[in-house]
Amino acid sequence: QGGFMAMDVNTGRVLAMQGGFSFQHSSFNRATQARRQPGSSFKPFVYAAALDSGYSPATIVVDAPIEINTPQGVWRPQNASNQFYGPTPLRTGIEQSRNLMTIRLAQEVGMDIVAGYAERFGVYDRMSQVLSTALGSDETTLYQMVASYAMFANGGERVEPTLVDRVQDRYGQTIFRHDQRTCVDCDVALAAGEAPRITSNRERVMNEVTAFQLTSMMQGVVQRGTARSAINLPVPIAGKTGTTNDAKDVWFVGFSSNIVAGCYIGFDTPRTLGRGASGGGICGPVFNSFMSEAIQTYGGGAFRAPEDCQFISIDRFTGARLPDGVQGENVVTECFREGEEPIFGITFDGGFAMGSDVPLFRGGADETIKTIQKSDGTTATVGGQASAGALGSGGLY
């Protein structure tokens, strides 16, 4: 069984909803009623909290083993590949759905902050503040997930799904309207092809630069990450896959500039969907099929960049700033807040901007002391680089 839902990211209008394979077989609406673990499709909310807490898409976080003491014993989370990748830019963490980087981010930012984001967006009414929930172990509905992703797509403004746009009385007077934004010139005759100006008065739930940074990172999921083989559409698409433990539920939630849609598939009584089942492989094609048709009616375009964005070329493998105008497969143009542009080098979680002459890994005891430049422009003297197995200070873990 499964569920599907699509909505307009600006008005909240629900464009499509499917609650199961057959209403005759079951009238249970899995889009609105089934509470399931979202798995990795929850991770963008952890990254949103990190981006608003001083991280950038180029910040380096160490992907390495981690152990958490719990009342049930020691918890040792793993990446899906059962491998570790060392120092990695934040962008890659979400593109490749790295569990260990996400746990480390949640630990650094604080689960109270992450839970606050999830509750503000409406993913949960009350989220458990334990680290495992950063990987999507709390239950929610597809309806709530799609509505929450809509706020990424529209630049961070609150929007609620609706099945009713407006209600009129028998005289044609509007007595209820869902969209409360102000239309500046709706009563004025406009030239053909000219749209009225709509002024937003909605609550802002996320900084618009953060929303754009996150959207750009989630475009990478589709372009070269866990959804790359499933999504092939003529307009820019951002999204996130989700696969729970033992592939009992699989998800994909994604959006264009004007439509957000999500899919989850799983058994009503949870059991594995089979070896190799994944959100990208099962739900990705469902999303792609729907959006292929929807785009023909609703179109789509580039995601709007905020005026406060400062675009800088970054090496997507190392997170290092590159000279303007460089090109190549390793180059990605990142948005930075004004005044927070990175210096040349690699910005580590923990505050250091390490020049290209300082390797990420080096065998440790005999290394000479080095002077490095911190992210605020000042310098600091540090000892030799630790080995890969010993790297563990400065907030990296």
PLM regions: where:
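Periplasmic/cell-envelope proteins involved in peptidoglycan metabolism and beta-lactam response
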Residues: Q1-R36, S40-P44, A48, S53-T59, ...
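Structural recognition of the beta-strand scaffold that forms the well-ordered cores
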Residues: G3-A6, L15-M17, T59-I60, T92, ...
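Active-site-proximal alpha-helical segments within enzyme catalytic domains
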Residues: V9-V14, P44-D52, D138-L163, V209-M218, ...
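Soluble non-cytosolic domains of exported or imported proteins
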Residues: S22, R35-S41, Y55, F84-T88, ...
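Short, glycine/proline-biased beta-turn/loop segments that scaffold the active-site neighborhood
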Residues: Q33-P87, V159-R181, A305
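Soluble, non-transmembrane domains of envelope/secretory-pathway proteins that act on or interact
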Residues: T59, P65, N69, W75, ...
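Active-site-adjacent helix/loop patches that line small-molecule binding or acyl-intermediate pockets
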Residues: V61-I66, T70, Q78-N154, T162
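A conserved catalytic-loop motif detector
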Residues: Q72, R76, D138-P236, T241, ...
